[in-house]
Amino acid sequence: MEQQIYLFGLNHKTAGVEVREAFALGERPKLGELLVDGEARVREALVLSTCNRVEVLVVDPVGRDPKAAVLAAWAGQCGQDPALLAPHLYAHQGMAAVDHLFCVASGLDSLVLGEPQILGQLKAAYRHAVASRTAGVIINRLCHKAFSVAKKVRTATGIGASAVSISYAAVELAKRIFGEMAGKKAMLVGAGEMAELAAMHLLTSGVSEILVANRTYARAEELAGRFKGRAVAFEEFVSRLHEVDIVISSTGAPHVVIRAKDVRAVLKARRHKPMFFIDIAVPRDIDPDINSLDNVYLYDIDDLQEVVEENLAQRREEAARARDIIGLQVERFGEWVKSLDVKPTIVDLLDVGASLARQELQKTLRRLGPEVPEETRAALETMALSISRKMLHEPIAFLKRRAKEEHGERFVDLTRRMYNLDREKVPTDAHADRKPPNFAETSDDFDVTDASE
């Protein structure tokens, strides 16, 4: 049965941070397993959940529309009403879904154009889908192709030439607030990948010291050691806030970790010297009410857009070149998908050819009598099957070429009728139920799943 690729998602373009918080699924979402094993019963599923997007990739038979089932399961996992999700959702299917995924993997759909973090996040989502056994033939091939396309884009264009990321944008915004960064102190709350990037950019910008707080103290020590900073016990970081000018928080906690009342006390201890807070976590780490305090500047992910726009100019030209690369690779992946439709016909054709060869061989052996040596019988069988294979070579090569065209299904249908491949198969002799050699595995000519670069 022909399969279709569907992609449903929301991102920073379609939904504000509040909506993304409500429908975030975490790093190891169970939604994929629920979609495959639950009521939806889709064939394959992969879920990508980051600060700026949640996307659900599914494979299901053509003719079935899994959208309602996906929305219901997704909203149910978050304890939300599907009606709240629908207005912010985008949906793609077929090659439009493939094109979107390739753009995401290449960083063309990111808040910061060309940022490389999303590729690592997609790889993690794929590993989770494989471990959960929700990735099948199509998602396996699609993800590996996406990884390959992202590599091509990064090496063939200059889209990733400069160090631009959410963390970089956060540091750029801090430089706008304070001007000179020399002598400023910063604290990172959370020690994940985003914090690591922030530490690198902070150090480059000239801050004098970096404090790192994390629930796992060993990880805080590790990150602090790499950037000549100091580790802080997570339970103590609030009491140390008065020491720093800049706070970048990215814990991934399900609740606020920096409260407005704590910041009021910190400001008093600092004699109301300005403080700059960047909240790059979803759900948010920092109480939005602190924005009402004097001498406090609070920005979340959505506020970074203005800074990000200034870093896009040099990448937009490269993005056009990247689109050309992606367009070609989408076309090639489409050819591979079409080859899946023709594969059963090729297998049936090879089966019929091998069956006829064996039937004629049996007639010949009966005429020759029982005295024919087994070695001769084996040689005759090899010859008969080889002739069958060679006779079918050109028809199969023709069918593979034509199947990739716009109306390729017509050639598949014509071949099935021409060779009567849909007739009821009835064994005609003792050898009729023997499995024929798998020519598709023994010859590149019959590699019906080829989708080479």
Curated annotation (Swiss-Prot):
Keywords linked to the UniProt accession: NADP, Oxidoreductase, Porphyrin biosynthesis
EC number: 1.2.1.70
Active site residues according to the UniProt entry: C51
Uppermost EC category: oxidoreductase
Site residues (Important for activity), renumbered to this chain: H100
NCBIfam families: hemA
Protein name, as recorded: Glutamyl-tRNA reductase
Organism encoding this protein: Solidesulfovibrio magneticus (strain ATCC 700980 / DSM 13731 / RS-1) (Desulfovibrio magneticus)
Lineage: Bacteria, Pseudomonadati, Thermodesulfobacteriota, Desulfovibrionia, Desulfovibrionales
